[in-house]
Amino acid sequence: MGKPKTYAPANYGSVSEALLGLYTGKVKDVERDMLFDRFTTSLLSDAELLAKPMVLLLGQYSSGKTSFIRYLAGKDFPAMHVGPEPTTDGFAALMDGTSGTAIPGNAATSSKSRPFRALSKFGSAFLNKFCISELQCELTDQLTLIDTPGILAGSKQTMGRQYDFSAIVKWFAERSDMILLLFDAHKIDVSDELKEIIETLHAHDEKMRLVLNKADCLSTEEIMHVYGGTMWFLGKVFTTPEVKRSYMSSFWDKPLKNPELERFMTEERQ
């Protein structure tokens, strides 16, 4: 009987480098031989394993996703559009970079240094609606934020999409460390498409957090009704018995309007 194999300890400088070394040396060849990417997630690239933590933002149109990102970043960013109507019609990855410009989807998915090469499988219709927004700030130095199109209320509005919205959201969710689901506190509703998206993300339920945005104009009584209504709506969609952690405030650079709840909402912002 031969002696068991012994391996010299790997000299890795970080946990990310250790994961990359172990995945490349022991897992990737097995996945490739077993055609793992044909029936589940695609093979991971070096850039994906070494990428910064990712946060995915989802919500119906005009829920304040883009303003939320601007509030966190502290400045405008490339490809930013804010307005009462559905303004964000594509996916944007806010990342650290010196160019201060928006990199189109085709170029973004061609770069080996970016963790988005696998997105090319969704076709040119999606790539035309995807970009990387490079911005230097404290936020992007620590993580990557994914802004998404507003989820629309009716099926007719979604018929014009030439790409699989649910599949793309699922791809980002699989690689995200946190998923923020934003609601406008003035118009709580769960559309059919939003229900479909939440059901798609059941496997990533532990990553999800709720944000009730634009809440500073509401009274204490109204906030209680809004919170109760939101939990009632989502209770019919989420399958887990636990209540999701929720944050309630107005995430923009304007002063809070309700002095009675200013302290509470300031703490929620932090």
Region roles according to the model:
Residues 18, 68-72, 175, 193-197, ...:
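Alpha-helical scaffold elements adjacent to nucleotide-binding pockets in ATP/GTP-utilizing enzyme cores
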Residues 10-14, 50, 63, 67, ...:
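Charged, alpha-helix-enriched surfaces in structured cytosolic catalytic cores
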Residues 200, 204, 208-209, 214-270:
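Canonical P-loop GTPase G-domain recognition
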Residues 99-101, 150-152, 186-188, 215-218, ...:
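Conserved nucleotide-binding/hydrolysis micro-motifs of P-loop NTPases
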